[in-house]
Amino acid sequence: MEMRGKITKINENGLGVLGNILVPFAYPGDEVEVTETRERFGKIIARDFKLMTPSPLRIPGKCSHFGKCGGCLWQGLRYREQLKLKEEIFKRITGIEAEIKGSPRIWYFRNISNFIITVNGIGFKEFGMPKTVVNIRECPIFSERTPKYLKALKDFLRESNLKPWNWREGDVHYLQVREGKFTGEVMVNIIAHVPLNYREALMEAFNFADSIYWSLKADKKDDPRGFPTLVLGNEVIREKVEGITYLIHPSVFFQTNSYALPLLLKSVEKFCEGSKVLDLYSGIGTLSLYLAKRGFEVTGVEVNGTSVEMAKRSAEINSINATFIQGKAEDAELEGYETLIVDPPRKGLKEFSRRIVKKGPNTLIYVSCNPLRFILDYRNYLSEAYKVDDALLIDMFPHTPHIEAVIKLVRR
């Protein structure tokens, strides 16, 4: 299918809209000529297009891989326009007007990156093409040291003669790198399908890292997950945000933008009522530790045992008094608190919302990177007992359409 015209708007997934065609890397005001399309999930997506007349909102991309790599749909859009679009998209999805706070840094802000290692290249997947890899040289949203990390990986692969992933089999699958943006510490984690037999080569290639892990992957799923074993260095790396040192292990989640994290922490604190706070899906205690340091009496509940261990150890080294319990958030005792914080996985709360409706406190703070899931939880369950009192958006993900929302709900 071919079509020429002007992009009229951006859809909820960050794609330009041209009639019934969705155009990646295109922005309102762009005049484009779509020359090739494909169908995916019932949608017609532009596979190739020519930019005939650029929108005044457009700027040159900083990255040489922009336009192919699927990581940064909006890198060619002025940052203030990105923020405006995120407010508009959030309102379109939820019906809620909310102010957005921009990230203090919009380049080299990510503290984690997962480089897929394949026979076709090492890097990130092409937009909409899950088996096509962009062989990258740089990544301006992750780290200025990306070329150094990739060179070390290639040196190791050459010395070890290990085979890259070919979508069915292979020895090594991912290189995961984490950086402490405020500590300078680096963790390297190789996700592989074979045990480590080239320890010396690995240590030599990544001799700059503070922590080196080898994670054995038991399945063939295309994700950067395995069972980590420490090869050399420290068990954890540290990140320091708002005066709190957080301990980070390869098996845990940490917010990906260390520079914007203070905005998220302060937004949650602003919405808290009373002194007794229950933090569900608390992870390594990112919110709990900050709130406890600010004087709240906080209990965090998290199912991941390693995350709970990191939270407890972080509390100890920071001399912070907070309680952390390992268990399912859905089984937590909800009574006796004045504020409940939920930061669920992307699938949302679903049926657990019914218990919150019955037994939750007067104030509920819903932290979400998935506005659609939030509004489904709200309309289907939470609205029975709660109403939206306030909301703030934090741009944790510049150059992408992703939105982090903090929504305050109060009992009707």
From Swiss-Prot:
InterPro entries: MeTrfase_TrmA_CS (IPR030391), NA-bd_OB-fold (IPR012340), RUMT_ARLMC_TRAM_dom (IPR048845), SAM-dependent_MTases_sf (IPR029063), U5_MeTrfase_fam (IPR010280). Keywords: 4Fe-4S, Iron, Iron-sulfur, Metal-binding, Methyltransferase, rRNA processing, S-adenosyl-L-methionine, Transferase. GO terms for molecular function: 4 iron, 4 sulfur cluster binding; metal ion binding; rRNA (uridine-C5-)-methyltransferase activity. The keyword Calcium does not apply. It catalyses: uridine(747) in 23S rRNA + S-adenosyl-L-methionine = 5-methyluridine(747) in 23S rRNA + S-adenosyl-L-homocysteine + H(+). NCBIfam families: rumA. This is 23S rRNA (uracil(747)-C(5))-methyltransferase.
